[in-house]
Amino acid sequence: MAPELTALTLAALVQVAQFTLFAVPANKDLTVDYTLSPRDTAPPKPLAKGTARLGRALNNHFEALVLFTIAVVVVTLGDKSSPLTATCGWAYLAARILYVPAYAFGWQPWRSLIWSVGLLATTVMLVAALL
């Protein structure tokens, strides 16, 4: 398997882990009765600060993973895999792994810098696919 596809697969598994890290405390914060409901009403109380941060980090990864997936597909189908695109794939993965604790624990300015590494890696992959 191309290294970019391996990084994408591992990034998806990071997403699953993030979902679990968020869902468990969210069920405790909001109660299982609410989380199993159709959610037609507002939550009975807000999420705890840490749980809310994990939720925002999860949503951010959904957004970032879309662009990274496009980059991996274009590089792979375009037969443009190279040491540069492989390095970018691993950089994206490392950034997404580090982003979770950075967001959860409020590491400033590191959270934004880590996010930037992931976006830059994705952008470089897209540009490399065009060259």
Regions flagged by a language model, labelled:
Residues 10-13, 58, 90-94, 113, ...:
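Hydrophobic residues within alpha-helical transmembrane segments
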Residues 12-22, 69, 73, 96-99, ...:
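Helical transmembrane-bundle signal
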Residues 59-72:
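Core segments of transmembrane alpha-helices
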Residues 82, 124-131:
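Juxtamembrane boundary at the C-terminal end of a transmembrane helix
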Residues 80-91:
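Structural signature of hydrophobic alpha-helical transmembrane segments
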Residues 1-40:
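N-terminal signal-anchor transmembrane alpha helix
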Residues 23-31, 79-80, 108, 131:
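Transmembrane helix-loop junctions in multipass membrane proteins, especially transporters and channels
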Residues 97-120:
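Interfacial loop-to-transmembrane junctions
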